[in-house]
Each structure stands twice: as C-alpha cells, then as structure tokens.
Design a protein with these regions (language model features):
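C-terminal partner/receptor-binding element of secreted or periplasmic proteins
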Residues: 174-209
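Generic hydrophobic/packing signal
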Residues: 22-27, 201, 205
Length: 209
C-alpha cells in the first residue's frame, strides 16, 4: 500500500503544470572563452522551461530545460553548448561542468563575475571536498536519499575566461561583500550564511550596487 501511495505521489509531482516557459531569440555560447569574448551563435525559437520538482526528483538534473524546434540544435543544446543568454538572462549548462547532471542553471552576473545555481557536482574529488558523501549517509536508502540530493542546490562561481569553478562559501561571500560594508556587517550576523536563500539575497543586493 505504501508503495502505491508513493508511486501516485511521484506521478502527481511529475505531471505538475510547467512554469517559466518562454520561446524567443537567444545567444548561444559554445565555451566560457566565447562568452568572455562575446562570440556567439544566435537562434530564434529557443524554449526555456522551468523543470518541475517531480521531473528533477525522477530524472535529476538542473532547473531549466533549454531546447529548440530544430532537433539537431536541441541535441547540441543538451550535450555540448556551454551557455545560453535569453531575455538578458544567462543559463549555464551543468553537463559540461559535471554539475547536477543535465540541463541548465540560472546564473547571476555581477560585474565580470558569474554565480551559477546548480545541483551537486558529479566529479568524485569535488564531492569529497564538499563532504557530499556524508549527506548520503552511506549507500542510498531506497532511492530516497538520491531524491533528496537531486533537489540540493549550490552556488558556484564560474571563473572566466576558462570556466573553472568553485563553490560559493561564506568566506568567499564575505570577501565579495567587502566593497559594501553595510552588507558585510549584516551578512556576518546571519545564522545560516551558506543557505541558498541567504546567499541569493546578498548576491542580488550586491548586484544593485
């Protein structure tokens, strides 16, 4: 009975209405170096779709699916493209960076710095650095831990022009806020300084400066 209820719950999640859908002109970047140098391809009819919680639990991956009516371009967008700018928003593909699996994460641009919101790293050395194994509690239990991990998000700083990455920790955030003493003082008082909503709030405040 419990298995049936769980299965029905998953079906409901997967078939939630999709939000955040758009279809428009986009700039397509094949590498971080191309983005840094302003070299891009352009295309009409690019779709940006916010994936549902159920889709992420069932299939993993990041928060945004980007595709095209052109099947060849859609395949390239999924597996090869580094980033897409659509409606002045930058989305970076997690697949080439081995972050969160497939699909794209929304990226804040602050000056010349990029902050990507994406899933857990798939690179084992990176996982070890972030102590992700401890979050799993050993082997995954009946897929539940795996589902929880599929929803975990981190902010990563993506360094241009070559695209190396590092996780945004409280020490790095404090360093970023050094140019805004009022924000730095407020951030120092946060009880959970590495929670995503907290980091996002300060990134957005810094972006306004």
């Amino acid at each position: 009975m419990k298995k049936i209820i769980f299965a029905l719950f998953i079906i409901v999640l997967v078939f939630q209405p999709v939000s955040g859908f758009s279809q428009s002109f986009a700039k397509i970047y094949n590498s971080p170096t191309d983005f840094f140098n302003g070299i891009c391809d352009s295309s009409q009819g690019i779709s940006v779709e916010r994936r549902t919680r159920g889709q992420i639990i069932m299939n993993g991956g990041n928060d945004f699916k980007i595709s095209s009516e052109d099947k060849v371009l859609s395949k390239k967008l999924k597996k090869q493209v580094w980033g897409v700018v659509c409606n002045d928003s930058l989305f970076i593909n997690g697949r080439p960076l081995k972050l969160g699996g497939s699909w794209y994460g929304y990226t804040e641009i602050i000056g010349k710095r990029l902050f990507l919101l994406a899933g857990i790293p798939l690179d084992k050395d990176f996982q070890d650095q972030m102590a992700i194994a401890s979050m799993m509690g050993g082997p995954l239990v009946a897929g539940i831990a795996g589902a929880d991990l599929a929803l975990v998000r981190y902010y990563y700083e993506v360094y241009l022009p070559y695209g190396s990455i590092s996780i945004l920790k409280k020490e790095k955030m404090a360093e970023l806020l050094a140019t805004a003493p009022d924000l730095a003082q407020s951030y120092a008082l946060e009880e959970e300084p590495e929670k995503i909503p907290v980091l996002k709030r300060y990134l957005l405040e810094l972006k306004k400066r």
